[in-house]
Amino acid sequence: MKEFIPSKLPLKKDIETKEILRATITAHKTLAELKGIANSLPNQKIVINTLVLQEAKDSSEIENIITTYDEIYRSDISDSFINSDIKEVQNYKDALYLGFDIIKTKKFLTINHIKEIQSTLEKNDAGFRKQSGTVLKNPTTGEIKLIPPQNPKDIEELMTNLVDYINDSSLEDFDSLVKMAIIHYQFESIHPFYDGNGRTGRIINILYLVLENLLDVPILYLSRYIIKNKADYYRLLNDVSFNDGLNNWILFILKGIEEISKETIKTIKNIENLMNETKNIIVEQKPKIYSKDLLEAFPDVKGFSVTNISYIR
């Protein structure tokens, strides 16, 4: 198999078919509903903390880093519970928060920002690949599916082009959700790092939604959708490169945005119910200590919701 070098962006293709336009409208509708519900919450922090934890676990699971919620919460209480997989999940959470802070303060994303996010994930400063030899294989069969760019100059040029595309909406007159699908494919195809490409790419997804003002906080994550549709995810991703499958890839991502938006709305409502139940229990059993400040402090309590995370989901 030959080395595959993706075309630079914009693609200059007519890809917004009627089917894609319909799927885009539906995805926007559910995403807007999610944004509105999240913004109406009196305390967004507990929602963000819960969903970031779920994403850190799920995104790591795609890379065969398997943990449980109880293990994660125990590690938050005491370092004695930390193992290598738990540390990977914690690193992902730190990298995601770092990226969100960058978008909030800078309002754009640079190559150095992406390197910083990946460095937080992998705890190394290797930066972009400088040595050849990286290949992408089928995780089940071991078959080589893609040989990404090998020349460091190509990687640097493609990543410069990608961040320009991320930051400059005038480069292509596509809907932002369609562009997110293109950005995700492009990053995966470049595969600029030795390690952590998949998780870095999924962080870029949510940061792009915030950058485009489609969400105010990082609460929509496609990792659960990818886990449920893992074979389709890798097949469709590969088809973009070799079978002119960009339209099907975009439809897959738009469906994921719609599906996960609905699931996240349900999760937020469950969190609200849980908080109200907690409030009622405290008022009934410990009325002297109850206060609004106490209830809103729960997200900062180590181990909070360790017994309720399955109910929240």
Model-assigned labels for residue ranges:
Residues 1-313:
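FIC/Doc superfamily catalytic core
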